[in-house]
Amino acid sequence: MSGHSKWSTIKRKKGALDAKRNKIFTKLIREITIAAKIGGGDIESNPRLRVAVNKAKVANMPKDNIEKAIKKGIGGNEGVEYFEITYEAYAPYGVALMIKCLTDNKNRTSSDVKSVLAKGGGSLGTPGSVSYMFYRKGLIVYNLEKYLEDEIMEFALEVGAEDILVSNNEAEVITSPDDFDKVLSFLKTKFKEEVAEIALIPENKISLNKDQAEKIILLVEKLEDFDDVQEVIHNLEIPEELS
């Protein structure tokens, strides 16, 4: 159960994460607001909101910020209207990208994404050109510097996880989307997760050398620097020296 690296966004060094905390919070607040607007403000009956709030808690967002974002979402159609867009794209060396956006201006976002892709040697794909390479799964990630791999594996499989993947001091618990809440709720009684979300999982990962992988990482980071871009999912197998 090894040989995989992180499924979701590329991991940044702590200093860079701290420097971008406000940007991260802005994106999380936007996601919480949209989730509450679409499905209501009750976390128990709104799975998307539940996942968004959990992400915010993992990122140490203050409770007050979370509550304000929910109230803003259930306040109706006041203020800016956001649209959800997912762009399918290719990075250099055949790496596939799924670029998830929340935007109040589709034309601006499309132009920005195309520009960064072009400068980074990538290109925008047509609908369906990349999405077939990914499938939806529940993802719960634990830091193995805090917990024992065997304990996580035992409890996760007991409660119905599909798989546990270990790489780079992390254990990734994979579930079906339907079992995600059940597995997460049980594991929360034992461990504190680093990530918990319904994620797009690549069917296969592409292995590149260090220099090539760095080029992909830089492109992903430039895309994620845009406020409109919520997340970039890729199928790059990140070399251990870069993780």
Curated annotation (Swiss-Prot):
Gene3D superfamilies: 1.10.10.200, 3.30.70.980. The keyword Nucleotide-binding does not apply. Its main location: cytoplasm. Keywords: Cytoplasm, DNA-binding, Transcription, Transcription regulation. It is found in: Cytoplasm. One of its GO terms (molecular function) is DNA binding. GO terms for cellular component: cytosol. It comes from the Bacteria. GO terms for biological process: regulation of DNA-templated transcription. Transmembrane segments: none annotated. InterPro entries: Integrase-like_N, TACO1_YebC-like_2nd/3rd_dom, TACO1_YebC_N, Transcrip_reg_TACO1-like, Transcrip_reg_TACO1-like_dom3, YebC-like. Belongs to the TACO1 family. HAMAP family: Transcrip_reg_TACO1. This is Probable transcriptional regulatory protein BB_0025. It comes from Borreliella burgdorferi (strain ATCC 35210 / DSM 4680 / CIP 102532 / B31) (Borrelia burgdorferi). The lineage of its organism: Bacteria, Pseudomonadati, Spirochaetota, Spirochaetia, Spirochaetales.
